[in-house]
Amino acid sequence: MQAKSICFIGGGNMAQAIIFGLLKQGYPANQITVSDPNAAKRQCLAEKGVNTVEASQTDTQDAVETSEVLLLAVKPQMIAAVCQGLSAVDFSQKLVISIAAGVSVTKLQSRLPTAKQIVRVMPNTPALVAEGMSGLFAQNSLKPEYKQFTQDLLNAVGKTCWVTQEADMHTITAGSGSSPAYFFLFMEAMQQALCQMNMDEDTARLLVQQSALGAAKMVIENPDLPIATLRENVTSKGGTTAAALQVLNQQQLQHIVQQAMQACVERSQQMEKLF
């Protein structure tokens, strides 16, 4: 990836995950600037050689003006204030990337009228361990070099996929943005069940986390096999696995998952109207 000067507005967990992922790939730290009001976060980043500024309007505006790329890594309710503070900046020759949930490209364009090159990103928390999944959307006018740069940027912390319709970002939210929590809940339930069977907590956690990791790896390493086939391959008729799956099917697990993901989509749609 050809390095560009990047200014991050916000230095929270997701911003740090991206920054540290870039640094691990050899991205020059002096090409990265972070604006954040938290002194401890700035210190942590500065120790890695990253430029930092306090979140004052003047310092932030100066940092953005001298950068080729602006990456908005703040909560969606802060977007309006952040963009207002950058109203004097000319974005016509800059790439703007937003990881603020629920903030549409159209809304960003209205907040930053001179910005013509905008990418909306929905990352997820496994980016913190370089195993993230990010959905990306941009209008057709996005320059190819900016599209590639954004993809490379997010690939530093996992995998990426592009959608051609912004409405699909709601589905991305259900499929990857929020989905780590679904897996955490299922793993939590398994751990609790084992503990109720007199398994100690540490051993129960080990059994669950390694089984989850192994199952995910089998899916990844067998791309031509449907996930259903992998399930069928470990389910012997009349066996222990079949007994467990019968209960899950009786409780309509698949229907519950579908309902949960639909609720996620609907809430994402509602949030987009708020910001």
From Swiss-Prot:
Compartments in which it is found: Cytoplasm
UniProt keyword annotation of tRNA-binding present: no
Coiled coil: none
Keyword Metal-binding part of the UniProt annotation: no
Domain of life: Bacteria
Listed GO MF terms: pyrroline-5-carboxylate reductase activity
Pathway involvement of the protein, from the record: Amino-acid biosynthesis; L-proline biosynthesis; L-proline from L-glutamate 5-semialdehyde: step 1/1
Top EC category: oxidoreductase
Chief place of localization: cytoplasm
Keywords: Amino-acid biosynthesis, Cytoplasm, NADP, Oxidoreductase, Proline biosynthesis
PROSITE patterns per the UniProt record, alphabetical: P5CR
An example Gene Ontology biological process: L-proline biosynthetic process
Pfam families on file: F420_oxidored, P5CR_dimer
Enzyme Commission code: 1.5.1.2
GO CC, one annotated term: cytoplasm
Reactions mediated catalytically: L-proline + NADP(+) = (S)-1-pyrroline-5-carboxylate + NADPH + 2 H(+); L-proline + NAD(+) = (S)-1-pyrroline-5-carboxylate + NADH + 2 H(+)
Primary role: Catalyzes the reduction of 1-pyrroline-5-carboxylate (PCA) to L-proline.
PANTHER family: PYRROLINE-5-CARBOXYLATE REDUCTASE (PTHR11645), PYRROLINE-5-CARBOXYLATE REDUCTASE 3 (PTHR11645:SF0)
Family that this chain belongs to: Belongs to the pyrroline-5-carboxylate reductase family.
Name by which UniProt lists this protein: Pyrroline-5-carboxylate reductase
